[in-house]
Swiss-Prot record:
Descriptive protein name: Plasminogen-binding protein PgbA
Signal peptide limits: none
UniProt-annotated location(s): Cell surface
InterPro entries (UniProt xref): PGBA_C, PgbA_N
Gene transcribed to yield this protein: pgbA
Protein's organism: Helicobacter pylori (strain J99 / ATCC 700824) (Campylobacter pylori J99)
Length: 450
């Protein structure tokens, strides 16, 4: 019990001494090296590894254009590496094309009041929460559920921080409480913490969630290394420590090159021409910014040319489509005219055939002998009777031929009408299809113009 009270007092004292890095900070950029993607600004109380983001102020709104990580602090000046802002990456939102420039503001520690806590058991978990009352610890149940039974990896922890808007992670290792930045995973602070009394640990860390299983393949790939709590997290933090040492050495080399470049730049500076007065030549920062602007303008010019080519191609396709539509209309009109002429010719043939039939019938009736002129002669009567009977036998034949001719003409007429209807149906379908294609092409052309 006495050991617990001493630990609580010690943790409270340390938390009060280190509360400054938890407070939000805003600084102005004083130097930008676009080719190297390096910026410099007053350090204040910033530490290596702290994460921030660059904000550019426009006429009536602000844009986050970059995210930064401090890589060196020397003589009150902080050096940071910047890159495109990806912490809230969203493919359905527009991507800013601006870059960091002198005068932009850098925001730090905006989410450092929220943290994840990774502890081996409930005792240390509650102890750390009680001694850091100014921090809003997100429940470890959410983090273990997010990991879904897999061992905590740096990439997964960063994703969880972005999802829950967390700025720092507290990780308990052997006799140490490590406070790391979520985005850079650099160690911001170390505090002494007695872990000698820990006899039983939770996997992958303490939480109230149980029964999460990553499955057979998950266990195969993840390895369940976090069952050995202190060995796993000691190695995880040491890995980041080695990375920190490599970054420091790299930044020392970068600083040396920057100093040489600045000395050389100062040596080759010359005054401008007399008509430009006594103004000095552009500084290295201005040249780098102008170079970046020219590169950006060239990229914009290529994009504009590509858009113009697309627009020209779409216009050409629309014109071709209109030309094809005209050809379709002309062909359809020509076919319609031919069909009408064919129908008129069929009707003319019907009239001619009807006249011929009528003339044949009249001629046959004129050739028959008159029964009234031969009424007085008996032989003539017999002959007339025989002729009448013969005429009666032959009469059905012309009538049968006429019926066949009439049926044949009706069939021709019905067939011609059916062909005309089919042609009109095809013409309507062609016209509807062409109108639909024309409307789609016009919509595509309007989209390209926009």
């Amino acid at each position: 019990m006495l050991r617990l009270l001493i630990g609580l007092l010690l943790m409270s004292f340390i938390s009060l001494q280190s509360a400054s890095w938890q407070e939000p900070l805003r600084v102005s950029i004083e130097f930008v090296d676009l080719p190297k993607k390096i910026i410099r600004f007053p350090a204040h109380d910033l530490k290596v590894g702290e994460f921030g983001f660059v904000v550019t102020k426009l006429s009536d709104y602000e844009i986050v254009n970059s995210e930064v990580v401090i890589i060196a602090v020397e003589n009150g000046v902080a050096t940071a590496k910047f890159k495109a802002f990806e912490s809230m990456k969203q493919s359905h939102l527009p991507t800013p094309r601006m870059v960091a420039k002198k005068g932009d503001l850098v925001y730090f520690r905006q989410f450092n009041n929220q943290a994840f806590l990774i502890a081996p058991n409930d005792e240390l978990y509650e102890q750390i929460r009680a001694t850091n009352t100014d921090i809003n610890f997100i429940s470890s149940d959410l983090l273990v559920t997010f990991l879904n039974g897999f061992d905590p990896k740096i990439a997964n922890l960063r994703k969880a921080c972005n999802v829950y808007s967390v700025g720092v992670i507290y990780i308990v290792t052997t006799n140490t409480l490590n406070i790391l930045s979520c985005e850079s995973f650099e160690i911001l602070e170390k505090r002494e913490l007695d872990t000698s009394g820990v006899t039983k640990t939770s996997t992958p860390f303490f939480s109230r969630v149980e029964g999460i299983d990553a499955g057979t393949l998950g266990k195969l790939f993840s390895g369940s290394q976090s069952k050995n709590y202190f060995a796993y997290y000691d190695a995880l933090v040491k890995k980041e420590k080695r990375k920190e040492v490599r970054i420091e050495k790299k930044e020392e080399r970068i600083d040396a090159r920057e100093n040489k470049r600045e000395i050389k730049q100062e040596a080759i500076k010359e005054p401008k021409k007399a008509n430009q007065g006594t103004e000095n030549a552009p500084t290295l920062e201005e040249k780098n910014y102008q170079k970046a602007e020219r590169k950006f303008d060239a990229k914009e010019e290529r994009r504009r040319s590509r858009d113009e080519r697309k627009k020209t191609k779409a216009t050409k396709k629309a014109m071709e489509f209109e030309e094809r539509e005209k050809e379709h209309d002309e062909r359809d009109e020509k076919e319609t005219e031919e069909r009408r002429k064919a129908l008129e010719m069929d009707k003319g043939n019907e009239k001619v055939n009807a006249k011929e039939n009528e003339r044949e019938i009249n001629q046959e009736s004129a050739n028959e002998p008159s029964s009234e002129n031969n009424a007085t002669l008996k032989d003539t009567e017999n002959t007339s009777v025989l002729k009448e009977s013969a005429a009666k036998k032959e009469a059905p034949k012309p009538s049968s031929k006429e019926e066949k001719r009439r049926l044949k003409e009706e069939k021709k007429k019905a067939k011609a009408e059916q062909r005309a209807r089919e042609f009109e149906q095809r013409a309507r379908e062609h016209q509807e299809r062409d109108e639909k294609e024309l409307e789609e092409r016009r919509k595509a052309l309007e989209m390209n113009k926009k």
